[in-house]
Amino acid sequence: MKLSLSPPPYADAPVVVLISGLGGSGSYWLPQLAVLEQEYQVVCYDQRGTGNNPDTLAEDYSIAQMAAELHQALVAAGIERYAVVGHALGALVGMQLALDYPASVTVLVSVNGWLRINAHTRRCFQVREQLLHSGGAQAWVAAQPLFLYPADWMAARAPRLEAEDALALAHFQGKNNLLRRLNALKRADFSHHADRIRCPVQIICASDDLLVPTACSSELHAALPDSQKMVMRYGGHACNVTDPETFNALLLNGLASLLHHREAAL
């Protein structure tokens, strides 16, 4: 699996791995790259079955497989210890990595994540699946911003959204791959295992997230032994895109604090 690695800003700089959500594209993290690359070696990638890592996914494709293939690619690139920043599905992959490779994951940041899918989130995905089945990729892509962004943010950026739609259609991961990745997301359940995660965790959520209620992050915080929760008042599901200034400050401060906390504990 192809990875994109930034040059380390200094010798032995900590590594931060960015894992996007259901869309799977590493470019989702563009608003974070410039600030992160000043302090860390940053790893981005298109998830298997998407973008520049095309593949046909099995029907039983799982979050555990997503975690294993990423860890194997990191080890092949010479990276054995790393912090993980995951958004939604990416946060699930991050938790799986922390469970399966505890010696490798130094810190976990969960952005609008959850222990197991909430009934409201499931309802949102049911609607989106119906759109996909009835209207194809175009209907899926057209509806996607409604679940990602606040209304006023979208209204002020119509040309940008049109360009994003065209790009998303051009690089659509395919109906079968999308549904198999979505099914993996829906099956994931960390409610009985989260307390085994021993690395420090930063939880970031947005109070106006239409797709994932903030209660999901509260449940995460209660279940994870060494976690802290930060709530953004604005930003929607893709709060790192819509309000990068606020998000980046939370992320940078959280990573610095938790990595120091981890080193002090060793």
From Swiss-Prot:
Annotated family: Belongs to the AB hydrolase superfamily. Hydrolase RutD family.
Organism this protein belongs to: Escherichia coli O7:K1 (strain IAI39 / ExPEC)
GO molecular function, one term: hydrolase activity, acting on carbon-nitrogen (but not peptide) bonds, in linear amides
InterPro entries attached to this UniProt entry: AB_hydrolase_1 (IPR000073), AB_hydrolase_fold (IPR029058), AB_hydrolase_sf (IPR050266), Pyrimidine_utilisation_RutD (IPR019913)
One family name in Pfam for this protein: Abhydrolase_1
SUPFAM superfamilies found in the cross-reference section: alpha/beta-Hydrolases
Keyword field contains Hydrolase: yes
Keyword Iron: no
Gene Ontology annotations of biological process type: nitrogen utilization; uracil catabolic process
Keywords, in A-Z order: Hydrolase
Function comment: Involved in pyrimidine catabolism. May facilitate the hydrolysis of carbamate, a reaction that can also occur spontaneously.
EC numbers, comma separated: 3.5.1.-
Catalytic activity field: carbamate + 2 H(+) = NH4(+) + CO2
Name used for this protein in its record: Putative carbamate hydrolase RutD
Top-level taxon of the source organism: Bacteria
